[in-house]
Amino acid sequence: MQPLHGNCLIAYARHKYILTMVNGEYRYFNGGDLVFADASQIQVDKCVENFVLVSRDTLSLFLPMLKEEALKLHVHKKVPSLLVHHCTRDIPVFQEVAQLSQNKNLRYAEMLRKRALIFALLSVFLEDTQFIPLLLNVLQPNMRTRVCTVINNNIAHEWTLARIASELLMSPSLLKKKLREEGTSYSQLLTECRMQRALQLIVIYGVSIKRVAVSCGYHSVSYFIYVFRNYYGMTPTEYQERSAQELPNCGSAASMAAQGIFYGTDRSAEGIRL
């Protein structure tokens, strides 16, 4: 089968379990082992019932939740192709994640829940010193992801091109050039990050429009509403009303988001203990 570059795999061994590497090597695991691996190094067709494939897009959403210092690490030339965390108790959500991952026609609330549960599983490995190097090795984040990580860690800050470049240990001109090569700019990414955070605060937490504006770095509520309408095609209030009608049963996803599992908060870096 084709190598799955840019994707990761999470496997859970309920009993003794074997993974086959692409080089023909067999890796043996005991019951209770949770495995995080570079999917391109695993023959995933051998373990369909026991794994969740995490796409590059999902990994790219998880990465900005981490502190920006993590992205200053150099991608290691020698990192393991997989990590193992032995869980002292069963993981009931794993089967649910696996089932959701196999469903190609998920409702919006189900998509949120699947992503939240995947992030929860990924957080198990946060205390492993090899986790971030392996994640970066697989994902090799582009400049867009690095910039968004910096912005999301302090969304209300008055960011400038020079300040972001300083956080990423490069010159403003080099940062501008790299972003241009990726078809974007720091101002565009700043707006995207703030609008995404605004949507989270409005839809998930029900925060007032004035507080959302301040939390997202806007000193003028009217200007915030103007930017929001240009970005989403409707005002914050209109979006809130529409979401309330479309997502009456998303309490589970919202609850997980409030605990810092789905969206980037300081608590998300603490992970969960199993």
Swiss-Prot record:
**PROSITE patterns in UniProt:** HTH_ARAC_FAMILY_1, HTH_ARAC_FAMILY_2
Q: Which InterPro entries match?
A: Homeodomain-like_sf, HTH_AraC, HTH_AraC-typ_CS, Tscrpt_reg_AraC-type_HTH
For this protein, the DNA-binding region equals 162-183, 209-232
Regulation: induction: Expression can be activated by RpoS and repressed by CRP, H-NS and GadW, depending on the conditions.
Q: Name one GO cellular component term.
A: cytosol
Extract one GO molecular function annotation from the record. Answer: transcription cis-regulatory region binding
Q: Which SMART domains match?
A: HTH_ARAC
Q: Does the keyword Repressor apply?
A: yes
Oligomeric and partner information: Homodimer.
Q: Any idea what this protein is called?
A: HTH-type transcriptional regulator GadX
The gene name reads gadX
